[in-house]
């Protein structure tokens, strides 16, 4: 019931003080039985529909219905109900590593939690009477004691937790120390056992140690032997006896690989010194390091023999752990790859030759030279194919600096006006509705009466400032509508009451849901005779847009843009929705926002229509907008005035950029022009590299496609110039979408502004058609167009562009040859003729058989011959054609195998023009 929910209060005004139940049911458009049931549920019993309902009883019924639908009786109660609830939204970002083939990929996971706290009714209803000062003091002391006790309990719990943790750590350390001691004891036992097993028996008793160390004699085969080492010099020292020279020679001669360096039972002093004190070595390692590798060469007693016997040079031939070892597994490198990389740079990072990388690319089906750039995905695939690991390089240094500037601009947030986008099907009255709100005539100024740009306006109403974005409704402007939905706060969907839901209406609903913005439906043209608002509500149910009348949450407002009916109600609904959203923004500091539309003005240069989302945009600010930059020379609002600054949710036109930015680019204000220029140049470089990679890939795909087809596709080249960037984007998407397997629409160049000499030269070189959308060619361009015979066409409505390009493309397709059967003859008997051979006596069972048309002979529904007629006779006369139900004689040229029961099929070939 609409009046019960406060949407049409005029019903209550029209009701008299005493009304019967029947009359009340007629006023609120509710069955009498249902109204009686609702009155009974509200606690009022009536015997019949003719009883009188007083104002008190009506208010009681109204309060009951409000409570039933979850509404408060008064605004004060509604405010109190809202104050009892608080909703907390929490977002948590996590990174999860998942396996993706040979590598692991990190995926960002966002966890959203929503929790609503409701204040209990008992807290307000069960509140005790005011306490006396003594009672308040006792209550405070009790709470203080309870708080102290809780703090003591918490401290005790934390102390016990710390004590348990320390005990666990100490226990773990003791276990580790015990394990180390056990391993050390086992190692010492193994060393002692190995030393006892390898120690030889003493040859003779050692002489008494002298107080001074004996001088070492020179080591030579003819010299005297060295005296034995004192007993306390080394724990491994053993008594030794002088050895004869021939014994040394024999020891050097019979020494083998891995044997002890021993001369007549005396251990080599150099080996003992070299490894003395290395207690960390096991017995086996000590023995291995003490061995002398290699075989002796030369005569016994020579210098080479002495080196091999364990002299000073013996350490060079030992194979210690620091010697070179050939790697047993390939080296896996971690290669950082940006958005694009040349094949030569990738080969250098992989430590491979450039030819090897080119071969790997060829095996993967990518034909590239060593100087060509490849994209990140291709480089990562070839890196994985060569056995290395690819990681994405972070080369956004200037982007990080830009983000840091944007974060510095954050300050105190204040309320901002809502940004409302008007969306809907073409000719449903979007611009007319906005025109009535603004009290201007914008719709009549658009070509064809349809909107082809995004119009941005802000309107000051009695309920505050509201910024409106008027989007086109034509199917070609899909990207414009999607861009408008992304930067908006509220979407007003305009639906004509006589037309209902149309394709672009459904698309607008999808854009609004994808952007996650609330929707308000304005049912327009209710003043027309065939208006049916209920039909609109039912059709939008299929798109999951449920009206409040049907139990949903979407507001439906019936308006008329022509006479202004319901416009104030629509503005109220927008203001109410904006209050619910609680829109906030930083009003001061560096500005940032989005480009809505851009164009090239002949007198003012590049002009960008931007929507400020944060901060304040002022004249003189340095701006970075996509790949363009510059200093703000002037600001203009929709009325042509120059405001001093533009705050959040205010659309303005900006002059002073270096070029025309693309619609949808984000802009941000920076400190100086140098940073702005560096960021813009880096973005331009990245975009150019990506474009080169994409063009190389497209060229290769075109070559492969031409190889796979015999004749290849017909190509229609176009040069598109328009007045604004949004129109260029819409034209490109709409015209390229006309391509199919037989013809391809190729846009070789597009841009904003008039048609220049370079545009004409490009069209002449590629034999392209020039399309000017709301722009004209200058004198030099017209001269080139006339001299080269270039097809130049001007348009102002996008419908005409699409239709004429379809006609031109259809002309390139040529004609298609089709065969159409015109008659069938049944062979009843076969006669022999001396002149024609076999002559078929036939009955025409369908259509007409003509002498000049080709025929086919079918036997058991299978074609056995295709040729032409040699003779067609009716009785004995030659005739040109024989119609259905007539007997005739047919002579088939160069075919004498006609049999009874065959069918002769007569057909003709016709040419049909091909269309897209």
UniProtKB/Swiss-Prot annotation:
Region (G5): 560-562
Key words of the record: Cytoplasm, GTP-binding, Initiation factor, Nucleotide-binding, Protein biosynthesis
Database matches in Pfam families: EF-G_D2 (PF22042), GTP_EFTU (PF00009), GTP_EFTU_D2 (PF03144), IF-2 (PF11987), IF2_assoc (PF08364), IF2_N (PF04760)
SUPFAM superfamilies from the UniProt entry: Initiation factor IF2/eIF5b, domain 3, P-loop containing nucleoside triphosphate hydrolases, Putative DNA-binding domain, Translation proteins
Region Disordered: start-end pairs: 151-262, 280-328
GO cellular component annotations of the record: cytoplasm; cytosol
Places the protein is found: Cytoplasm
Main location: cytoplasm
Annotated Basic and acidic residues bias: 151-191
G1: region residues: 424-431
GO biological process: translational initiation
Residues forming coiled coils: none
Domain named tr-type G: residues: 415-584
Residue ranges, annotated region (G2): 449-453
Domain of life: Bacteria
Family, per entry: Belongs to the TRAFAC class translation factor GTPase superfamily. Classic translation factor GTPase family. IF-2 subfamily.
Role summary: One of the essential components for the initiation of protein synthesis. Protects formylmethionyl-tRNA from spontaneous hydrolysis and promotes its binding to the 30S ribosomal subunits. Also involved in the hydrolysis of GTP during the formation of the 70S ribosomal complex.
Protein name: Translation initiation factor IF-2
The species this protein was found in: Xanthomonas campestris pv. campestris (strain ATCC 33913 / DSM 3586 / NCPPB 528 / LMG 568 / P 25)
Taxon lineage: Bacteria, Pseudomonadati, Pseudomonadota, Gammaproteobacteria, Lysobacterales
Gene that this polypeptide is encoded by: infB
């Amino acid at each position: 019931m609409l009046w019960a929910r406060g949407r049409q209060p005029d019903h209550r005004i029209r009701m008299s003080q005493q009304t019967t139940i029947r009359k009340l049911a007629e006023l609120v458009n509710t069955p009498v039985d249902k109204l009686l049931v609702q009155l009974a549920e509200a606690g009022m019993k009536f015997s019949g529909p003719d009883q009188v309902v007083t104002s008190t009883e009506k208010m009681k019924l109204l309060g009951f219905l409000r409570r039933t639908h979850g509404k408060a009786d008064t605004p004060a109660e509604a405010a109190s109900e809202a104050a009892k609830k608080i909703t907390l939204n929490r977002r948590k970002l996590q990174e999860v590593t998942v396996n993706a083939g040979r590598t692991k990929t990190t995926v960002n996971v966002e966890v959203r939690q929503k929790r609503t706290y409701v204040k209990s009714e008992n807290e307000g209803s069960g509140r005790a009477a005011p306490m006396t000062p003594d009672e308040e003091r006792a209550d405070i002391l009790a709470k203080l004691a309870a708080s102290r006790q809780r703090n003591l309990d918490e401290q005790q719990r934390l102390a016990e937790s710390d004590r348990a943790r320390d005990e666990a750590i100490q226990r773990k350390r003791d276990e580790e120390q015990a394990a180390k001691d056990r391993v050390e004891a086992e190692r010492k036992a193994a060393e002692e056992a190995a030393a006892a097993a390898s120690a030889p028996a003493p040859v003779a008793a050692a002489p008494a140690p002298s107080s001074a160390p004996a001088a070492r004699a020179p080591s030579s085969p003819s010299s005297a032997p060295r005296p034995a080492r004192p007993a306390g010099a080394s724990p491994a020292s053993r008594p030794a006896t002088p050895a004869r020279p021939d014994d040394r020679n024999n020891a050097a001669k019979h020494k083998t690989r891995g044997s002890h360096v021993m001369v007549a039972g005396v251990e080599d002093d150099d080996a003992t010194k070299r490894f003395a004190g290395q207690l960390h070595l096991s017995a086996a390692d000590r023995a291995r390091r003490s061995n002398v590798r290699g075989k002796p060469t030369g005569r016994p007693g020579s210098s080479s023999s002495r080196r091999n016997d364990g002299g000073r040079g013996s350490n060079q031939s030992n194979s210690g752990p620091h010697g070179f070892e050939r790697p047993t597994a390939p080296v896996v490198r971690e290669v950082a790859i940006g958005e694009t990389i040349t094949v030569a740079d990738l080969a250098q990072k992989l430590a491979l030759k450039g030819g090897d990388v080119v071969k790997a690319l060829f095996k993967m089906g990518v034909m590239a030279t060593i100087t060509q750039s490849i994209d990140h995905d291709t480089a990562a695939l070839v890196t994985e194919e060569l056995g290395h690991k690819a990681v994405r390089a972070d080369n956004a240094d200037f982007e990080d600096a830009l983000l840091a500037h944007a974060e510095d601009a954050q300050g105190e947030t204040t309320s901002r006006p809502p940004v409302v986008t008007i969306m809907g099907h073409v000719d449903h009255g979007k611009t007319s509705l906005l025109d009535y709100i603004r009290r201007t005539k914008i719709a009549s100024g658009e070509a064809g009466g349809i909107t082809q740009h995004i119009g941005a306006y802000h309107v000051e109403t009695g309920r505050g400032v509201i910024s409106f974005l008027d989007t086109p409704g034509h199917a070609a402007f899909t990207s414009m509508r999607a861009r408008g939905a992304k930067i908006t706060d509220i979407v007003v969907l305009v639906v004509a009451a006589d037309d209902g839901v149309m394709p672009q209406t459904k698309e607008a609903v999808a854009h609004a849901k994808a952007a996650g913005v609330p929707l308000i439906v304005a049912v327009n043209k209710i003043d027309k005779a065939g208006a049916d608002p209920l039909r609109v509500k039912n059709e939008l149910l299929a798109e999951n847009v449920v009206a409040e009348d049907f139990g949903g949450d979407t507001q439906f407002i019936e308006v008329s843009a022509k006479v202004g009916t319901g416009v104030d109600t629509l503005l109220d609904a927008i203001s109410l929705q904006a209050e619910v959203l609680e829109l906030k923004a930083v009003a001061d500091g560096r500005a940032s926002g989005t480009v809505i539309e851009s164009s090239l003005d002949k007198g003012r240069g590049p002009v960008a229509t931007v929507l400020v989302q944060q901060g304040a945009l002022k004249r003189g600010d340095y701006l970075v907008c996509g790949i363009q930059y510059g200093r703000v020379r002037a600001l203009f609002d929709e009325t042509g005035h120059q405001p001093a600054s533009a705050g959040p949710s205010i659309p303005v036109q900006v002059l002073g950029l270096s070029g025309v930015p693309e619609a949808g680019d984000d802009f941000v204000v920076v400190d100086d022009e140098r940073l702005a220029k560096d960021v813009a140049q880096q973005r331009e470089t990245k975009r150019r590299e990506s474009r080169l990679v994409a063009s190389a890939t497209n060229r290769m795909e075109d070559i492969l496609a031409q190889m796979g087809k015999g004749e290849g596709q017909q190509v229609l080249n176009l040069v598109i110039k328009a007045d604004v960037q949004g129109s260029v984007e819409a034209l490109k998407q709409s015209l390229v979408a006309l391509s199919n397997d037989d013809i391809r629409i190729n846009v070789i160049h597009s841009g904003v502004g008039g048609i220049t000499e370079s545009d004409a030269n490009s069209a002449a070189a590629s034999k392209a058609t020039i399309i000017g959308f709301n722009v004209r060619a200058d004198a030099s361009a017209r001269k080139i167009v006339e001299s080269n015979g270039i097809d130049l066409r001007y348009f102002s409505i996008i419908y005409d562009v699409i239709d004429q390009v379809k006609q031109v493309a259809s002309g390139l397709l040529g004609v298609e040859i089709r065969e159409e059967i015109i008659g069938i003859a049944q062979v009843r008997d076969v006669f022999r003729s001396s002149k024609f051979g076999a002559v078929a006596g036939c009955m025409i069972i369908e259509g007409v058989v003509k002498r000049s048309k080709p025929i086919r002979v079918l036997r058991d529904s299978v074609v056995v011959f295709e040729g032409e007629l040699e003779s067609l006779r009716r009785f004995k006369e030659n005739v040109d054609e024989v119609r259905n139900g007539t007997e005739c004689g047919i002579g088939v040229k160069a075919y004498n195998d006609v049999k009874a029961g065959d069918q002769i099929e007569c057909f003709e070939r016709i040419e049909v023009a091909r269309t897209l």
